[in-house]
Amino acid sequence: MFNKILIANRGEIACRVIKTARRLGIRTVAVYSEADANARHVRLADEAVLLGPAAARESYLVADKIIEACKRTGAQAVHPGYGFLSENEDFAEALAANGLVFIGPPAAAIRAMGSKSEAKKLMGAANVPLTPGYHGDDQTPALLQQEADEIGYPVLIKAAAGGGGKGMRLVERSADFLDALASCKREALSSFGDEHVLIEKYITRPRHIEIQVFADTLGHCVYLFERDCSVQRRHQKVLEEAPAPGMSEARRREMGEAAVAAAKAVGYVGAGTVEFIANQDGSFYFMEMNTRLQVEHPVTEMITGQDLVEWQLRVAAGQPLPLKQEQLEIRGHALEARIYAEDANKGFLPATGSLIRLQPPGESLHVRVDTGVEAGDEITPYYDPMIAKLIVWDENRDAALARMRQALADYQVAGLTTNIDFLSRLVACPAFAGADLDTGLIERQRDFLFPAVQPVPRDALLVAAVGELLWEQHEARQAARNSGDPWSPWHARDGWRMNLAAARSLSFKDGDTLIDIRVDYRADQWALSLGGSTTLARGRKLDGDRFAVELDDRRLIASLVAVAERRTVFLQGGTYTLLRDDPLHRVDAGDSQGGGLTAPMPGKVVALLAQPGQRVEKGAPLLILEAMKMEHTITAPTAGTLQAFCFAVGEQVGDGAALVEFVAEA
């Protein structure tokens, strides 16, 4: 076994590998960019080496720097995690050339599976079922369109070197093909350095089922059963589970044996995942093989009781697989939800910012949290916006779903927008709860998953007011203690006014709605008036930002996180955001809107889709912004004239930067 390994990655997967390595007595070396100098994986590792600037292409993707870090620290092997260089055959070969072990498959296997078109040919020869499609080398747009027309729409255009949902476009009709092809090629070139694409028939209501395989250097290969990853947004997984609901033993064996055949066809070693598209009639087709550990590997660990990172380390050290196929068994059901900094109501737009509060549910036999961040850390635009993976396990799917619902309700994040509320709706969705799964579930269930924005409920508003009053009292006491006259009445925050009732107003904004709560101070409580009715309230600070609240005869526990004027209320599993409004600083914003469209996040302009001076209709695409390795099309908010672009192709833009000068039609 190794004495020291280097982890060529960051975030939660680096922390995950460190955890197992530490248990096995293996020392770890972290690598980091300037943006990650204080990251959790750097703090957890025994040693850490700076690679370079924040941009991945100048740090985490520079193989020579990683090899040099190995030499400087004496690391014997490199665990690539997932993403970055994990599926780069040149990196694997470079490590071997420098006497270092790549904790992953042979370079030849990565190369064989790295090209989707080549992989399809190999799988066909190994009798692994294939989807109808075009996997040829001729990339002439006219030929590709002809092939798509012959396959029949809908078709899926996929980057041949792709993965992770990037470089994929669904095309419903021939007229849209060339635009989708151009966009797909741009994204493929940006993400993978290769614009080669393939085309496949798109199966209506498919399920995405993948098989975890493992092979050693002694010729043994097993499958550790399946994961259902059908719930996706933008072709990226959101919620995964194992085993797949409704999977029969016969079908599980058939898919598992097909996955093992796929692995053996390329001389595979280590952890790999063979992904299949499964039809509603029970047929299944090879999609791709990911030659690395998957993000969702924890659900497999939970149902098998195996540590897959330990398996990786043992196999890379030349040891045999820990178990044979007949020794592996499924126990219970596991679910994994990916907690992202993103706004589900804005097309899952990635978010950035500081994790002012980060309180995951407590871990136990049933609940696991894999994360690479802690409270106070920043989610930056440079890397994937994942905050954590929330994994639950129980004896059956219904019990696991109940665990997930509670764990999501207990998850508290403040400082930026997350998808936690969306995930809560997803696990409560009747279609998901009933295992009516396919990759279009989120789109099919839009009405349930994306309800109209509701106003912050009355209880949350009253709790916010109580939290504000308690905080004011706390500040007043602190000021009194620190003053030369602690008994001065001027320190009191009790609403006292000469010759008037002790009362005041607290003002908040819920979106664009202004909310005034009248506070009447009583001897040991407040009378809070809102919307024509009055509630008697008491409050008592607990630990941190938690406090106990009494609203008439009801007792609640809540938290209030305040950053500048932003207030985040955590109450009974819900998260509510308000702005503290100061009447003395109100301005009329009615005419403050400029004539430009702003960047929803930091990114790079990759295409301009209109001409200055051109009249456009509402929804017309104006430009494409690339952020976090995804393309985002900026469209006209209304009919009008594009006056000018503020940036050229290739230029970086900041969050909120004006992108175009636009004049709306009257």
Question: Which residues fall in each region the model found?
Answer:
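Structured, non-catalytic alpha/beta "coupling" segments that mediate domain-domain communication
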Residues: A77, E87-A94, E336, K346, ...
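Conserved nucleotide-binding/hydrolysis modules and their immediate coupling elements
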Residues: D307, D520-R546, E550-L556, E565
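N-terminal beta-alpha lobe that positions the nucleotide/phosphoryl donor
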Residues: M1-V274, A278-H297
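Short amphipathic alpha-helical segments
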Residues: N3, K166-G167, P243, D384-L390, ...
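Catalytic cores of soluble metabolic enzymes centered on carboxylation/carboxyl-transfer
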Residues: A259, P298-S533, E651-A664
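Long, charged amphipathic helices and adjacent flexible linkers at domain junctions
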Residues: L323-R331, R446, F450, G574-A599
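Structured functional modules or segments
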Residues: V587-A666
